[in-house]
Design a protein with these regions (language model features):
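Extracellular adhesion/glycan-binding regions together with long Ser/Thr-
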Residues: 244-264
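Glycine-rich, charged/polar anion/phosphate-binding loops
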Residues: 215-219, 254-257, 268-269
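Exposed acidic/Ser/Thr-rich ligand/metal-binding surfaces
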Residues: 2-231, 276-277, 419, 487-492, ...
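A structural detector for beta-sheet-dominated domains
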Residues: 6-8, 18, 235, 284-286, ...
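Low-complexity, intrinsically disordered segments enriched in Ser/Thr together with acidic residues
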Residues: 261-278
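OB-fold and OB-like beta-barrel modules that bind single-stranded nucleic acids
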Residues: 15-17, 270-272, 281-285
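Short aromatic-acidic-glycine turn motif
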Residues: 237-245, 290-292
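Long, acidic serine/threonine- and proline-rich intrinsically disordered regions
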Residues: 275-497
């Protein structure tokens, strides 16, 4: 892991983190990507899948089932799969199942057995993660949780959910946590907060293609983590402009949770205010390849290459754009047009000029598109019917979280918005590495060419050249049936307190 600490202007310091110590950003990305392709991590992916009654609409649950089944073809025998379903109650469907050929059939049967019914009890689902996750330092598997829901948790409170998530993060500090909202009716603020606290990503999906893209991105991310759950310890007077979770420590310092560093991904730049040359900043994480902890104490650089300064300036401006996006969201949803529309419009013009002046990069272009989107929303204001305004609000929440955290897939509108003239491909993330993009593309190809619950001849999976995985045939789906008898997996929990 490489950590470079430098100042971009008076009072503003940047910490640039990357998975390799290679000199330039381009060389680091190429070298790390090659290493990830040659030796991807063995993983344990824990899926928390909402199967409440509303998941039956628009084939939501079927899309998830099809994507999960296609994902099996991407997993190797040393990858493990856990599945927790939840509605009014939660249930461990599968726990720590290695992806051997025989086990794949068992997993397919259990996936196909899921039926939509009941309410949405996320707290119960989180309570069962303890039952399937491996304790820290007992395995070389990279572990991650993916929670998918289409609604609001109507059993338990937001505080219950975040408290339970924080407990999981304390007990299992290496665990990554991604959230996925299906459609526009989910609780964007909650899923965004959970992704921030879990040092993961917040994604929104609206159909089969989106589900495949996001699942591929999350799984590909787990396969290529080089350093897990990286965090920085800063003095109490230091404030971050970035969007990561921050918690006070007993000694008065604070921990900023950056999360995982993927091989082959862009560098992560944390923007800090108030840090001086005399202050101590510690960077901690775990080397996934060795399982050994790593600690760095970077010193403020006196001479900084221009390409490094460019990344720092971009990160600083990005933080300002994310703050602006959240303020526009507050304007759309707040009473009486607060904050002020005229002031926001003026800020948009100034920010657009600031971003345009930056060195041209895919991230800079993305920031310009988001500013244009915000200006459109400011000009049109509230829409009729109100669900369109709610949709825009959720979109801004998710885009701000994705850009602020620097991971995940931007949600797409699929032509639902009357002002949607954005021709950007929503399935291409500027934050994903080649492995993640290949995984997403592979899942999109297999789910698109093999309709779920359609009897047809078995077809080979579309090859994933970058992944170099063993190819397994896609078998015709089986009729829904009761899961195989497995007493240890039939527990349910409706009231976890």
């Amino acid at each position: 892991m490489n950590a470079q600490l430098f100042q971009i202007q008076e009072g503003v310091t940047c910490l640039l983190l990357s998975a390799t110590a290679t000199a330039t950003a381009a060389e680091a990305t190429d070298a790390a990507a090659a290493g990830a392709a040659a030796s991807p991590n063995n993983t344990h992916t824990i899926f928390l899948i909402d199967k409440s009654g509303s998941m039956s609409a628009d084939d939501k649950l079927l899309s998830v089932q099809q994507t999960l089944e296609s994902l099996l073809g991407m997993m190797k025998e040393r990858d493990e799969f856990s599945l927790i379903s939840f509605e009014t109650e939660a249930r461990v469907e599968l726990a720590r199942v290695a992806m051997t050929p025989d086990n794949r059939d068992i997993v397919r049967t259990r996936i196909n057995s899921l039926k939509a019914d009941g309410s949405t009890n996320m707290v119960a689902a989180l309570s069962y993660v303890n039952d399937v996750v491996y304790p820290a330092d007992t395995t070389h598997l990279k572990q991650g949780v993916l929670l998918l829901t289409d609604g609001h948790s109507n059993i338990g409170t937001t505080e219950d959910l975040l408290r339970r998530l924080q407990g999981l993060r304390t007990t299992y500090p290496s665990l990554s946590f991604a959230t996925v909202g299906y459609g526009i009716n989910h609780n964007a603020a909650l899923l965004g907060s959970m992704a921030t606290e879990g040092a993961g990503s917040y994604n929104v999906v609206r159909g089969l293609e989106d589900v495949a893209t996001v699942f591929g991105d999350v799984f590909g991310g787990l396969k290529t983590v080089a350093y897990e759950q990286v965090r920085l310890s800063v003095p109490p007077h230091v404030r971050q402009r970035s969007a990561y979770a921050i918690h006070a420590l007993p000694d008065g310092r604070s921990d900023i949770f950056v999360g995982d560093l993927q091989a082959g991904a862009s560098s992560v730049c944390v923007v800090l205010e108030g840090l001086t040359a005399a202050d101590r900043l510690d960077v901690r994480g775990t080397d996934v390849a060795t399982g050994l902890p790593i600690t760095l104490t970077p010193v403020l650089a006196t001479e900084v290459p221009e390409d490094i300064l460019v990344q720092g300036r971009l990160a600083f401006t990005k933080s300002r754009v994310v703050t602006f996006m959240n303020d526009v969201n507050a304007f759309l949803m707040g009473p009486g047009g607060i904050p002020d529309q005229t002031a926001l419009t003026g800020r948009a013009v100034a920010l657009r000029a600031e971003v345009t002046a930056l060195h041209a990069t895919p991230l800079r272009d993305l920031l310009l598109r988001e500013l244009q989107r915000c200006e459109t929303y400011l000009a049109t204001g509230a829409l009729s019917p109100p669900r369109l305004t709610h949709q825009r609000s959720n979109e801004l929440s998710q885009h701000a979280a994705t850009i602020g955290l620097g991971r995940g897939i931007l949600s797409s509108r699929h032509g639902e918005d009357p002002d949607d003239d954005d021709d950007e491909d929503p399935n291409v993330s500027v934050f994903s590495n080649p492995y993640q993009r290949s995984a997403s593309e592979g899942l999109r190809n297999t789910t698109a060419t093999t309709p779920y619950y359609t009897q047809q001849a078995a077809q080979p999976l579309t090859p994933f050249p970058y992944l170099n995985v063993t190819q397994h045939p896609v078998t015709p789906p089986r009729p829904l049936q009761a899961p195989p008898t497995a007493p240890a997996l039939t527990r349910s929990r409706s009231n976890p307190f």
